[in-house]
Amino acid sequence: MAKYDEKKQLKCSFCGKTQDQVKRLIAGPGVYICDECIDLCSEIIADEFEETVEFDTKSVPKPNEIKQYLDSYVIGQERAKKSLSVAVYNHYKRINTNKQDTDVELSKSNILLLGPTGSGKTLLAQTLAKVLNVPFAIADATTLTEAGYVGEDVENILLKLIQNADYDVERAERGIIYIDEIDKIARKSENPSITRDVSGEGVQQALLKILEGTVASVPPQGGRKHPHQEFIQINTSNILFICGGAFDGVDKIIENRTRKSSMGFGAQIQGKHEKDIGKLLKEIMPGDLLKFGLIPEFVGRLPILVTLESLDKDALINILTKPKNALVKQYKKLFELDDVELEFNNEALTSIAEEAIERKTGARGLRAIIEEMMTEIMYEIPSDEQITKVTITEECIKDKENPQVERLPEGKTRGTLASNRVKKDIESA
């Protein structure tokens, strides 16, 4: 490996050029490399990396595979899961197709999720990102304001995605962003107002470009933009935006529209509350969203409408027990770490579900109900070594009674039982 020429000049160990022929030589243990070879190596690595991260249609799970994965974590909402699986599959297929030279360029289809509180909107979006192994970010629309006003700029949503992709911009450009509480940025009235609505219509206007696809300038540290600041450039054309909201009150708009169409002789008269919210949401039209307060341009950039139903008692009981990370399984694991067995009887599960329905909190309220009821016993267990089993009954939920507790005889503790088990295992081995 030549380091010197005959004139005792340093040479690049890779290309053989002398120090006079290059701008810079960098020394290593027994070797030298010039700036030109460094640039060449960087290009080769960048090209290879681009090939490895490039999306291939074959690597994107098929709609039925995506739905199967969603089924493992999300109970019910069959129609919504199918719609989302197809929409996500088509989105990533579109990314791959648009890279090729084709006559037809496929446009982006963002998704709007509508459903009552606690119906699983956020969980669906999070689970989609897991199955696809893409960066994911959640943003709260209520914190966003128009540029120049107190609050977060819309570009800060993109920063969260970049951070979750470990500042790999290229990977972030294929990610998913979930914007929650999107119904809270509806303008205050259907008719345009002369006063500025900086957290409603103003935010909708600010979101239009990034939803459609643009090269946005994002401050690396977040916050407001200011002159002489460096920006991260990110293209949002291939980012999938999923917007979600409860849209309280939109059911009345749908009901009024559907009522008008069934007036006259022979029309079937329905009671005022005959249809539930879930069924009404299935009949939603873009015009209903305009009446609710979303501007036409914003609705146009969310062409896929996916509605979720209110969860009934059976669905809530299944949510407590069936998913991979079901709440009952989580609490059993927590107790198991203290060598205590936890059991919920069927009546207790039914009572928890009924309480969640009464509170109108959906699946989100299940944890709060369990936590309220179990705080006292979880406080006692670590310091009471004689407790071995806890049973949650219907009375614990309805009458606020203490859970049933099984204890060891005097003089015995969970610690001594555990050490005896270890000794037996060692002896048998």
Swiss-Prot record:
GO cellular component: HslUV protease complex
Species this chain originates from: Clostridium botulinum (strain Eklund 17B / Type B)
Annotated region described as Disordered, given as residue ranges: 401-429
Family designation: Belongs to the ClpX chaperone family.
Residues that bind ATP: 116-123
Protein's name according to its UniProt entry: ATP-dependent Clp protease ATP-binding subunit ClpX
GO molecular function annotations of the record: ATP binding; ATP hydrolysis activity; ATP-dependent protein folding chaperone; protein dimerization activity; unfolded protein binding; zinc ion binding
Subunit note: Component of the ClpX-ClpP complex. Forms a hexameric ring that, in the presence of ATP, binds to fourteen ClpP subunits assembled into a disk-like structure with a central cavity, resembling the structure of eukaryotic proteasomes.
Sequence positions that bind Zn(2+): 12, 15, 34, 37
Protein encoded by which gene: clpX
CDD domains: RecA-like_ClpX
Function statement: ATP-dependent specificity component of the Clp protease. It directs the protease to specific substrates. Can perform chaperone functions in the absence of ClpP.
Compositional bias annotation for Basic and acidic residues: 401-413
